[in-house]
């Protein structure tokens, strides 16, 4: 399952990189690729059958990092200023707290809560950016709905997140919990859906920009003739 998820994430990251290379000055796609990169590395780390402190520390940084990059991608897509410094400080402090708890030998759930909350805060920033947009089109609304679903998944999976380091224990939870099976399936749908919607918005924005530029050039060229 982890390998399937990694393959999907890698393909989406490559797609984002291709979009960035093809459509210049579209920083939203490169931030999106960075978010997927964090998610891909996290998936690789979780495929390890042995739970090591290094693996836990890596995931503790990658989870909030992925959501921060996603938030920055949304901000770039909506042409908003970069992520607020206070949010970055809060996310960094929570992530550091998880690392300190790991070094202190805290329980798995207690250790994972700060960095999971950090990721939730970063995701909430992207959700608020979309919610506050006055003129939302159908893609904005769809993306907002997907991000809200992702937020629900993040909160619902907080208690069982440490079990991701133990595939056997996680399989037992999935067999016993219909909710967790639904959440896993939803997570595999929301990520590619959000990426494809954002790429569609980037492409449509570039097309609209080219049309406006062409219309402006046409009006400029016709101006002297009409006068």
Region spans (language model):
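Juxtamembrane segments at transmembrane-helix boundaries
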Residues: 12-28, 41-174, 181, 188-192, ...
């Amino acid at each position: 399952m982890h390998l399937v998820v990694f393959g999907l994430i890698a393909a989406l990251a490559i797609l984002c990189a291709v979009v960035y290379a093809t459509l210049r000055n579209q920083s939203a796609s490169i931030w999106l690729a960075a978010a997927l990169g964090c998610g891909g590395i996290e998936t690789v780390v979780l495929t390890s059958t042995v739970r090591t402190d290094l693996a836990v520390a890596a995931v503790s940084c990658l989870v909030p990092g992925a959501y921060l990059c996603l938030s920055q991608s949304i901000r770039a897509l909506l042409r908003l200023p970069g992520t607020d410094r206070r949010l970055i400080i809060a996310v960094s402090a929570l992530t550091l707290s998880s690392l300190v708890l790991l070094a202190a030998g805290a329980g798995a759930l207690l250790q994972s809560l700060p960095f999971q909350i950090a990721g939730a805060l970063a995701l909430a920033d992207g959700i608020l950016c979309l919610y506050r947009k006055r003129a939302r089109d159908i893609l904005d609304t769809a993306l907002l709905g997907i991000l809200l679903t992702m937020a629900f998944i993040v909160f619902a999976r907080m208690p069982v997140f440490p079990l991701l380091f133990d595939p056997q224990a996680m399989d037992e939870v999935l067999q016993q919990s219909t909710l967790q099976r639904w959440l896993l399936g939803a997570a595999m749908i929301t990520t590619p859906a959000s990426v494809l919607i954002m790429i569609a918005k980037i492409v449509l924005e570039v097309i609209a920009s080219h049309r406006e530029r062409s219309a402006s050039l046409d009006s400029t060229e016709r101006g002297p003739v009409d006068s």
